[in-house]
Design a protein with these regions (language model features):
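Bacterial Sec-dependent N-terminal signal peptides
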Residues: 1-31
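Charge-rich (acidic/polar
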Residues: 25-135
Length: 135
């Protein structure tokens, strides 16, 4: 049985969205790393994956430490407004992931950008474009 890549991506996106919501409540409990630690972990992962220079790691870390909390703030606004429409949460996620990718493209080399896309970012971008086209 072959799974539809769109369905897989949608499931992963929903899980990520729910995880972000749970992450905010878990911050108070100390169960999971906070949003800044997650940004550092992602910067470290990309450094290993893409062989980033120190200055590039700094920019990745700075980008994520700005954009992750901003995305979480938008999630909180939706949650406080008692929005139940999952597509609105997905739109917020897509907006911030697109902004992060645009930032990365500015300071990654062409080889790093290609490797980043091959690591799964290209699939995510295509899925975002499909969702955007449906609107």
């Amino acid at each position: 049985m072959k799974l539809n890549p769109y369905v897989i991506f949608l499931v992963v996106s929903v899980v990520m969205t729910l995880a972000c919501g749970n992450m905010a409540s878990a911050q108070n409990q100390g169960d999971q790393p906070d949003i800044y630690e997650q940004a550092e972990q992602e910067a470290d992962r990309l450094q290993r994956l893409l062989d980033l220079e120190d200055w590039q790691v700094f920019y990745v870390d700075s980008t994520l430490k700005h954009d992750f909390p901003a995305m979480m703030a938008e999630y909180d606004e939706l949650r406080k407004a008692k929005v139940a429409n999952q597509s609105m949460y997905q739109s917020v996620h897509d907006k911030w992931m697109e902004q992060i990718d645009n930032s990365y493209k500015k300071f990654f080399t062409q080889e790093q950008w290609t490797a980043y896309l091959k690591s799964g970012a290209a699939r995510a971008q295509k899925a975002r474009e499909k969702r955007k086209a449906k609107k």
